[in-house]
Each structure stands twice: as C-alpha cells, then as structure tokens.
Amino acid sequence: MVVTAVIPLTAKKVKVEFDHQFTLVLYKGELNLFHLKEGAQVPDELITEIENKILKKRAVKYAMHLLQKKDYTVKELTDKLLHAGYSDSCAEHALEYVASYGYVNDKYYAVRYLETYSDRKSIKKMQMDLRQKGISDEMITQALEEAEMENEQDTLRCFAEKKARSLDLSQEKDRQKLLRFLVGRGFSYTDAKNVTDELVIVHNER
C-alpha cells in the first residue's frame, strides 16, 4: 500500500490514508517509528502489525473508557469506535473483548431501558428507541417478557393528567392537543382517546 495522505486531527494525532481509502489514526510519534510519510510504500504486514500490536489494544482501552461513563449497545459502541477512526477489525476486536466480560450486552441493555423508562414512555416508543440503538426485534421481544415495567395504562394516565394541567379541556382545540400529544408519545389512538374523554368528564364535573 502507498501512503496517500497524512491528515492532522489534533495536536498529537493524525489520520494516515493508504491508497486513498484505508485509514489508520496514529500519534505523530508513531509516524517516525514506522517511517510513514506521504508517498511511502508500506507492506501489508506492517499495517497488520500496527493494528494487532497497537491499535486493537488502544480500541479496547477506548471502549472501556466509554463504558465507564454509561452503558452502550453493540451498535452504539461500534459507531463510537468507527467515528474515532478505528478500523472495522479493531472495532470488532474491542467489541469481542468487552462482550466477553459482559461489559456490553444488548439483552441486558434492553431490559434495563424498559424498566427505566416504562413510567414515562409507551411500549411502542421504547421499542422504536431500542431499534434505533441497533437492538433486534427478537431481542426486544425477549426483553419485554423479562422486564419488570410499570403498567402502560398507568403511564398513559400519568402523562395525560400532567399535560392536561396546562390545557383547558372545555375547549375542543385543547382536547385535540392532548390527544395529539399522547399519540405522539407512542400510545395507541384508541387508548389516548379513552383517557382524554375520561379527563374531559372529570373536568366537566368540577
């Protein structure tokens, strides 16, 4: 491979581009160590050595650093590693390492997420959130069976009552506003309409 570009990233780091496509993020001192400069011919064996001896360990360290701050799904952590400039193989190595110790576990993440947010989000909204985080439908279904969640109707009622405090339910436009708010949070139209009607009755009885 040929070094086609050396791009400064920070005061200490650079991105080294090979053949206009493959890149590695290295410290500036490592450029001299491995004799990397624009136009240099680099054997594939050297790139493999850099990845195996330096970058894979560095990727593991970075992944551990991220996980000390918060939990991540496999997709989220992979995206973080790739965004930081690690190659697919380095990211895969880091994921395998942290997963082997149970530091990243999509099933556990999904259960925790459902239990944490069930008092403020609908099941539909939480399912959408988890899909965006890269968790499969099958795993979400398993998590729903295992998680100890708040009753969704109670969550809906709590949402509706809180929102209704800022509305005048004697006005049709405010009733529609409440209904749209609840549906927008992922609750079904039927359930949202029922609880809205119940709150209107309570409001009229005052």
Identify the role of each PLM range.
Residues 1-206:
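An alpha-helical, amphipathic repeat domain used for nucleic-acid recognition
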